[in-house]
């Protein structure tokens, strides 16, 4: 069964409502200043504290140093960290040494070229790969990419792969059928306005995922 991550939550109320609606994981953008959905570590800690025990919490970061991630993990205590910048494998190794219990998800930007080679570098270091559409702002723009490329990457790496980039209730079934990911990630595709999830769209998105074979 394809898992669902609802990303860009900004309040405990939204996060809990998404979890109750059936999300497997809740994502929060911590100190990612370029995003309108950016929240502080304190806010993320509060969101994490209200989630049910079997719903994963994922903080999304674009850190300058491994130490920033280590500090955030110790404060927020998330299930996983999604590294959304250009962090090399050694960056992840350093984090694992300091906080070995946290899962690490590395974003690969599709459209830059050499994606398979980049993804393979993180085998044995990352716990999963997330495929987002490349953009001048480093992804997170709500734009789709070629899902056939994603499927090729998924078939070439020995890691669970999460598909992101412009997904919505209208296209997620097609995306799953094309790429066959471990999980799908949605942010703006389930919003009526920025920073606020539309629970009708959240439920519709999750329903589309669950019924897709």
From Swiss-Prot:
Protein name: N-(5'-phosphoribosyl)anthranilate isomerase
PANTHER family, A to Z: N-(5'-PHOSPHORIBOSYL)ANTHRANILATE ISOMERASE
Family to which the UniProt record says this protein belongs: Belongs to the TrpF family.
Protein's UniProt keywords contain Kinase: no
Protein EC: 5.3.1.24
Pathway, per record: Amino-acid biosynthesis; L-tryptophan biosynthesis; L-tryptophan from chorismate: step 3/5
Highest taxon, organism lineage: Archaea
Gene Ontology BP terms: L-tryptophan biosynthetic process
Keywords on record: Amino-acid biosynthesis, Aromatic amino acid biosynthesis, Isomerase, Tryptophan biosynthesis
Catalytic reactions on record: N-(5-phospho-beta-D-ribosyl)anthranilate = 1-(2-carboxyphenylamino)-1-deoxy-D-ribulose 5-phosphate
CDD domains for this protein: PRAI (cd00405)
Gene name as annotated: trpF
One GO molecular-function entry: phosphoribosylanthranilate isomerase activity
Matching InterPro entries: Aldolase_TIM, PRAI_dom, RibuloseP-bd_barrel, TrpF_fam
Gene3D superfamilies in the cross-refs: Aldolase class I
